[in-house]
Swiss-Prot record:
Its EC number is 2.7.8.13. Pathway: Cell wall biogenesis; peptidoglycan biosynthesis. It comes from the Bacteria. Coiled coil: none annotated. GO terms for cellular component: plasma membrane. InterPro entries: Glycosyl_transferase_4, PNAcMuramoyl-5peptid_Trfase, PNAcMuramoyl-5peptid_Trfase_CS. It comes from Azorhizobium caulinodans (strain ATCC 43989 / DSM 5975 / JCM 20966 / LMG 6465 / NBRC 14845 / NCIMB 13405 / ORS 571). It is a multi-pass membrane protein. This is Phospho-N-acetylmuramoyl-pentapeptide-transferase. It is found in: Cell inner membrane. The keyword Cell wall biogenesis/degradation applies. It catalyses: UDP-N-acetyl-alpha-D-muramoyl-L-alanyl-gamma-D-glutamyl-meso-2,6-diaminopimeloyl-D-alanyl-D-alanine + di-trans,octa-cis-undecaprenyl phosphate = di-trans,octa-cis-undecaprenyl diphospho-N-acetyl-alpha-D-muramoyl-L-alanyl-D-glutamyl-meso-2,6-diaminopimeloyl-D-alanyl-D-alanine + UMP. Belongs to the glycosyltransferase 4 family. MraY subfamily. GO terms for molecular function: metal ion binding; phospho-N-acetylmuramoyl-pentapeptide-transferase activity; UDP-N-acetylmuramoyl-L-alanyl-D-glutamyl-meso-2,6-diaminopimelyl-D-alanyl-D-alanine:undecaprenyl-phosphate transferase activity.
Amino acid sequence: MLQWLAQLHDTFPAFNVFRYITFRTGGAIVTAVLFVFLFGPGIISTLRLKQGKGQPIRADGPQSHLLTKKGTPTMGGLMIFSGLIVATLLWANLSNLYVWVVLFVTTGFGLIGFYDDYLKVTRQSHAGFSGKARLAIEALIAGIAVVLMINAGRAGLSSSVAFPFFKDLLLDLGWFFVVFGAFVIVAAGNAVNLTDGLDGLAIVPVMIAAASFGMISYLSGNVVFADYLQIHYVAGVGELAVICGAIIGAGLGFLWFNAPPAQIFMGDTGSLALGGLLGSIAVATKHEIVLAVIGGLFVLEAVSVIVQVISFRLTGKRVFRMAPIHHHFEQLGWTESQVVIRFWIIAVVLALLGLATLKLR
């Protein structure tokens, strides 16, 4: 919205800064973090009052969780989502289709997560929204988003998969790209959801991934930088850097309250929304495969669950002491803070590897 002030630069020369994505990204970070700082305590108090017993804690999980996490309210994703939306509406170019597509996915996945959290809290059970129904709705939302991005993009590129390390290698999937793109978005949403099991564990890697994709969006949406780095230029995606900035700001504000011992949990409301958002930005910028590197921690968490389930069904034995894998390390004797900080370090390393693919071609 504030981007339109740049049109008044002849009268107010200082307003020219609103043209620049970098300036507006910084504004989005500051706006989102201040919003969450200001309204976070009130949201937490309201959720604690409404939820009573808070998020149900897994009885088969680490016993320390039953003591330290019991009674903590969930749906903290509402704080992140609110800060993200306010900052994006203020600082992004609202005539940009990609902005609205990403917000559509974020809102849709957030609503699914909210309903799932609501069922878990009211029933005081981990049996929330039906898994099949949830995946079906997520796939529908993601599919619509991918179709919109294909129609908005450049023919021959928007329906293609780009490969890191190869500057000219494109695999055009045609309309099958809708299935591929929807899978990326849904997988990202649920992978982040599985990662959100310890205080601060998910939000920091999400911010790291957002910072990485903020740079990727800016570079991919700038014809000069895209040509220099020999990555695929996608007109308009640079504006998604503003949304990435809003994620970082809202995430920093949320982490203030989610740092151990957490005053609030993100819940599916936040984790599904943020994962879907990252997935949709990856699809928009043509960096779907790079997402698997930058978000490798989320992939690891998701794969650990898949391996555990398949192994138990086929052999009756578990590969890990507990899945997702962060609980496995807790069972091995790592403290919660050790797991969280070490996983943060992994997220940083993977993000650097992912960003390196922009230059190594």
